[in-house]
Amino acid sequence: MAKTINISDAEWEVMHVLWSASAAMSASQVIDALAGRKSWSPRTVKTLLNRLATKGALGFEAIGKTYWYRPRVARDACAKREGRSFLARVFGGDGGAMLVHFVKNTPLTPREVAELKRILDGKEKRP
């Protein structure tokens, strides 16, 4: 992602719907997909779609009276940027402190613990 795009919490909800889709979606389809999760009016969803398009996070194409929206930024790129922002804001950029906090305060399955150990062992072996 060449340009930094700041996405609000509400906009993340819309982006998750579009990232999960296999093709472009109309505003009505996005509204329907969010209906089970959010009690937003159609106008609110359309406002969020317009904001995301203005920011460059979404592309759209008008076919007749219908606008079809698709992501222009990858989920991973947005998640990476948001993760860096969270790390800086909450933990002052200290990744180790963040990891310790989450490991101590998050229930983990034995499989997740094993995966964390594997990752940390790999970090120790690097110069």
What are the residue ranges of the model-derived segments?
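Short, hydrophobic-biased segments on the C-terminal half of alpha helices
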Residues: 46-50
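Short helix-coil junctions and helix-kink-helix linkers
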Residues: 32-40
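Short, cationic-aromatic polyanion-contact patches
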Residues: 5-10, 63-82
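Short alpha-helical segments that sit at the start of domains
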Residues: 1-17, 21, 77-78, 126
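Short beta-strand "wing" residues that participate in macromolecule-binding interfaces
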Residues: 60
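Short acidic, hydrophobic short linear motifs in intrinsically disordered regions
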Residues: 24-33
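Glycine-centered, phosphate/nucleic-acid-interacting loop/turn motifs that mediate DNA/RNA or nucleotide
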Residues: 56
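Amphipathic alpha-helical dimerization/coiled-coil segments
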Residues: 80-126
